[in-house]
Amino acid sequence: MKRSISIFITCLLIAVLTMGGLLPSPASAAGTKTPVAKNGQLSIKGTQLVNRDGKAVQLKGISSHGLQWYGDFVNKDSLKWLRDDWGITVFRAAMYTADGGYIDNPSVKNKVKEAVEAAKELGIYVIIDWHILNDGNPNQNKEKAKEFFKEMSSLYGNTPNVIYEIANEPNGDVNWKRDIKPYAEEVISVIRKNDPDNIIIVGTGTWSQDVNDAADDQLKDANVMYALHFYAGTHGQSLRDKANYALSKGAPIFVTEWGTSDASGNGGVFLDQSREWLNYLDSKNISWVNWNLSDKQESSSALKPGASKTGGWPLTDLTASGTFVRENIRGTKDSTKDVPETPAQDNPTQEKGVSVQYKAGDGRVNSNQIRPQLHIKNNGNATVDLKDVTARYWYNVKNKGQNFDCDYAQMGCGNLTHKFVTLHKPKQGADTYLELGFKTGTLSPGASTGNIQLRLHNDDWSNYAQSGDYSFFQSNTFKTTKKITLYHQGKLIWGTEPN
């Protein structure tokens, strides 16, 4: 009996810690396929990165800071936490060449090897980054680069999760045709003698912004991609125009470095601009890696000063940038794109017409995000035109600016509309509602919208107290609720508004 009680208490404790974000979610439990087990050898098809089955893959992850400075954050424990809690599928080991990096201290390559070995064990992809920066012309240390990549490719040529990035950010008096392309041809030749298949990423001019130049004079190798780097506070539509041009020319792009800050790595964070960039990358299925995993006191860092070097970070140890990046990786994990859950059947004797089912994507009463998941179902006998239907989720924001994201919708996130409405007179459990609408679509009798997964957060990423919100309740399965209201052409047709 005592043993049974002990087991029960242990299970309860694990459940509480998991809900509180102190332990990895069940999605990371043993038995779940790792990214590499699922996708295997990567290759290029057109402009797309594809897996062994030829299906498009979008990798998302984070980069180390310079290994010579912040290498202590790069270890198996931290990468495991990033895989299990953040959901990363790729990690970038940024080995600076100058500034106390490989050229002055070749032993820093041992940290690269540690990262690769950890990634192999954990089943995630890893980018070996020859991180030129102040030494802006890649030819300055070309022979050292060839020496380094000869060693790396001889070690990992049969390892499908390795990706080579052979010139981080060429800059200064450097151009593609004269400097970067000839360098790349020589280094690629060295790698291909040992590794015929793995992806190679080549930096482009002006700190890896001139993908348009590379697109006009592409390398011959079939599995080469071109690096695009941006910082949300500095770079905008003009750089996306360059990316669009490169894609139109058939040049595959990998964003191996981007930051929520300005180009200095400090200043900001610029979350609206970051969101605009990530929406763009998602629309093109472009893989990305965020800068950076460190506790350096600058806005692009993911961790606050003094955070653990081995993972296990509570949300309070994450910076605004780290919180944003974590949620944008977690929100698009493969688990949200599997076959949608089948909702429980409505009781047709009680629920005529259109109804709502809900579950809490984040059941914590104190959380920096609200994640309602909805099904809207037609229980009636007539087809419903969704463009005439809106749903309202009622909650308290306490005068904070609101942000909306759609993590997944069976009918497509692009088919949704939304607006936040502040009540002139607060009601019980609500001073605001989110109104969700639809651009197109119909629901035939008995049909459902399928799973709609939403995510809301305050501008400053502060916590909500969800326990007081009218529409919120803790449920990890879909349940019918009348506290999320439905309207047809503005007229209430389902549920009860708060008093």
Curated annotation (Swiss-Prot):
Superkingdom in the source lineage: Bacteria
Keyword RNA-binding: no
GO molecular function, one term: cellulase activity
Gene: bglC
Domain CBM3 residue range list: 350-499
A GO biological process held by the record: cellulose catabolic process
Family: Belongs to the glycosyl hydrolase 5 (cellulase A) family.
Residues given in the record as substrate binding sites: H65, W69, Y70, Y96, H131, Y231, A263, S264, W291, K296, Q297, E298
Species the sequence originates in: Bacillus subtilis
Catalytic residues of the enzyme: E169 (proton donor), E257 (nucleophile)
Basic and acidic residues bias: start-end ranges: 330-340
SUPFAM superfamilies documented for this protein: (Trans)glycosidases, Carbohydrate-binding domain
Record keywords, A-Z: Carbohydrate metabolism, Cellulose degradation, Glycosidase, Hydrolase, Polysaccharide degradation, Signal
Pfam families reported for this sequence: CBM_3 (PF00942), Cellulase (PF00150)
Protein name: Endoglucanase
UniProt signal peptide: 1-29
Catalytic activity: Endohydrolysis of (1->4)-beta-D-glucosidic linkages in cellulose, lichenin and cereal beta-D-glucans
Enzyme class: hydrolase
Highest classification ranks of the organism: Bacteria, Bacillati, Bacillota, Bacilli, Bacillales
Residues covered by region (Disordered): 330-353
EC number(s) from the headed UniProt entry: 3.2.1.4
